[in-house]
Amino acid sequence: MRHERQNISNVLKLTRTQTQMRRYKKNEYHCHIAPLFFVTSRQIKNQNPDNVNNEREDIVFLRDTVEFVTVAAEFCAYMEHSGEHNRKEFVDTLLKLLPLLYLKAQMLPNEESISDDNLEEFVTEDSYEVLRITISELLAEKDSYLDVFVADMKYSDTPITKSISEDLADIYQDIKNFVSLFQLGINETMHDAIVECNEHFKQYWGQTLVNTLRALHDIRYKTTLEEEEEDIDE
């Protein structure tokens, strides 16, 4: 079976360019990814002549993989500029972007790692904290929410208080490490990055994303209804 391949470095470069050019308008977020993946069979063969018969490395250039890389890069770019938006814009955008990230993660191929070495991590404790604090200040009193889908619930009869900012920083950490590994352009490293990201999605950040999405939905629509009721009372 012939798989579509794309030059990952060019994809990431194009994604960064699109991100810089895109304006995140109020109540609007467009993620233009489709044009990135249509290449001819001749282009595919010429770009990756050494990988044509290598099934293990083929997953790096699968369409589903490239689409996930693109959305992941979009997510990281937006998170890194989260302080430039007001709370409503931030919540509205994530309510569109997070479901797309979850959907594309589900499409990642299931494979095994090639190397036994630990993959490099790029997100530092300082950068993690800067992002978490930025989001926490942006969401203010709406940052905390009650959650029952956490491991600690087995020891408690009441919901656990969680933080949207911490959840998003956790998701960002996994996704940013993944995107950074892809930017290295080393097939074996990219292959193992896919495997690790897929495993972490199933075990950690996938559930965190769903929980956070519920909390963001509550902020977006419950807050709006409460404000409308207050206007009526006045």
Locate the predicted segments by residue.
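N-terminal interaction modules that seed assembly of large macromolecular complexes
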Residues: 53, 58-124
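Acidic, proline/glycine-rich low-complexity IDRs
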Residues: 159, 174-234
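Charged, amphipathic alpha-helical oligomerization/scaffolding segments
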Residues: 67-74, 93-100, 104, 130, ...
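Polybasic, lysine-rich low-complexity intrinsically disordered segments
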Residues: 7, 13, 19, 26-27, ...
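Long amphipathic alpha-helical segments
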Residues: 110-179
